[in-house]
Design a protein with these regions (language model features):
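Beta-rich carbohydrate-recognition and catalytic domains
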Residues: 1-166, 171-216, 227-278, 301-352, ...
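Beta-rich accessory regions
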Residues: 9-15, 252-488
Length: 488
């Protein structure tokens, strides 16, 4: 083990001992120290679910990337393990960027992007991003002596050697495949496909998909590719993507394409892109396939352009709650992993509760909960819910029935930076908003709309004492409310 990795492990252990766990997210992965971003290596090994992530332990801002590591059996209660990778080799000295993991020959294999710099003939330095592997036992990992195993020199000449990152690996029959985010010399985002029989010798296959319309960003980060029911799904996170009405608002977006994939020719016929998450804080999702057949997705619960953390907090970055995916009506629908029900406590239920003006319901309060609100077709114009609320703070979700717009507003959640606080969502169901399921943790709100047809993720930095929930309607209406505290 390198001295750099030993140092990171010692530092994170020291910081963990100093951290008040009662102020951290209860059931979401958060930075053990410093900073985390993209989820990496979401995989099954030795009977456990592993998640790694981009990690800089020494400051709450982005720095030379390490890989942090957590493990779970149920995706709700997570155990922090020591850091897995540090940028300690010549080929990754500028960072161990994002990647994935797979079990092979009883080893846990990490595939990641090693970042380094080369000196050009004219004396200028230029970055290079190449794909590397490491072999481990679920806790400690050894980098392959002949890294990198996939380099930009293997790609067509018009593909960038600088922006070539975030490999996602899988196996079909006797062949390993990986896709890698890329762009060409016209600044067109794309993903490339490579293959190997032994994980060590790789070859370029094809450009699997590209921004053929010119509307889907300049660089496709963190790609994922998998079958889901009778379709294949390509997920990526395009940079510099322009908004289209109520879609693709984050600049750094995450989108998915459904399509048909020919495994022999490696041709993917993709459909139009769709937004994965309509909220303010969601990027770089990655999926894994559980032993029971569920395809589950997790993402970084943050935006590159936002800093929604308390000023006194010395760490930054969380992951979303893992979500189950399914294809329905030509779209991906998402649900919180069903394991969350194992942690339901203190139920509180209202059937046909009257809302007229601002209303509070006894027993409906708290900051770590699973809250579902259902409404039938009724005569109102505006309906709103304020969460994590008191006299000073609130995060509101306001539905304007006439336009079918749901507005999220965290302006008063405690944020002290000039960040985006409002997002408007056009409800996809032509019948309008019927059900909202909120998953609240201490620093986040995840909203599942109409049984997961749309999802919106929002980070908040509200003092934990603000635990009120308020309802409002401009006309008398009735709702059904079901609340469970989440208790670990």
């Amino acid at each position: 083990m390198s001295e750099m990795l030993k140092k990171a492990r010692a530092y994170e252990a020291e910081k963990a001992a100093q951290t008040d766990k009662n102020t951290r997210p209860l059931f979401h992965i958060s930075a053990p120290a410093g900073w985390i971003n993209d989820p990496n290596g979401f995989s099954i090994y030795d009977g456990k679910i592993h998640l790694f992530y981009q990690y800089y332990p020494y400051a709450r801002e982005w720095g030379p990337m390490h890989w942090g590591h957590s493990v779970t059996t149920d995706m709700i209660s997570w155990e922090q393990l020591p850091a897995a990778l540090a940028p300690d080799q010549d080929y990754d000295r500028n960072g161990c960027f994002s990647g994935s993991a797979i079990e092979a020959d009883n080893k846990h294999v990490l595939v990641y992007t090693g970042v380094t710099k080369i000196t050009l003939p004219d004396g200028r330095e230029e970055e290079r991003q190449n794909q590397c592997i490491a072999f481990g036992d679920g806790r400690d990992y050894v980098k392959y002596e002949n890294n990198p195993v996939v380099t930009g020199e293997m790609l067509p000449e018009n593909c960038s050697r600088i922006d070539f990152r975030d490999p996602k690996i899988w196996k079909e029959e006797d062949t390993y495949y990986l896709i890698v985010g890329s762009k060409d010399n016209r600044q067109i985002g794309q993903v490339v496909l490579c293959s190997s029989k032994d994980l060590k010798e790789w070859k370029f296959e094809t450009v699997l998909a590209a921004n053929s319309t010119g509307k889907v960003g300049t660089m496709w980060e963190c790609p994922d590719f998998f079958p889901l029911e009778d379709k294949h799904v390509l997920i990526c996170s395009p940079q510099n993507m322009k908004a289209e009405k109520y879609e693709f608002h984050n600049g750094n977006n995450s989108v998915y394409f459904l399509g048909n994939y020919d495994k022999n020719s490696h041709i993917f016929e993709k459909e139009e892109p769709h937004t994965i998450d309509y909220g303010l804080d969601f990027y770089a999702p990655q999926t894994t396939l559980l032993p029971d057949g569920r395809r589950v997705m997790i993402a970084w619960m943050k935006s590159w352009d936002a800093c929604v953390v308390p000023d006194t907090q010395d760490w930054q970055g969380m992951m979303t709650l893992p979500r189950e995916l399914e294809v329905k009506d030509g779209q991906i629908w998402q649900q919180p992993v069903r394991e969350i029900a194992q942690y339901h406590k203190n139920p509180c239920h209202y059937e046909h509760a009257e809302i007229d003006g601002e209303t509070a319901l006894s027993g409906i309060c708290g900051r770590t909960m699973d809250l579902t609100v259902t409404m039938d077709e009724q005569d109102f114009n505006v309906f709103s819910i304020q969460l994590a609320a008191d006299e000073e703070y609130e995060t509101s979700f306001t539905y304007h029935k006439g336009t079918g717009i749901l507005e999220i507003d965290r302006t008063y959640c405690g944020v002290t930076r000039d960040v985006v606080c409002v997002r408007k969502i056009k409800i996809a169901d032509p019948k309008g908003l019927k059900k909202m399921r909120f998953i609240l943790d201490r620093q986040s709100i995840e909203l599942f709309i109409n049984d997961g047809q749309q999802v919106a993720t929002t980070a908040v930095c509200t003092p934990l004492e603000a635990e009120g929930i308020r309802f409002f309607s401009d006309k008398k209406m009735y709702i059904t409310v079901e609340k469970y505290d989440i208790v670990l």
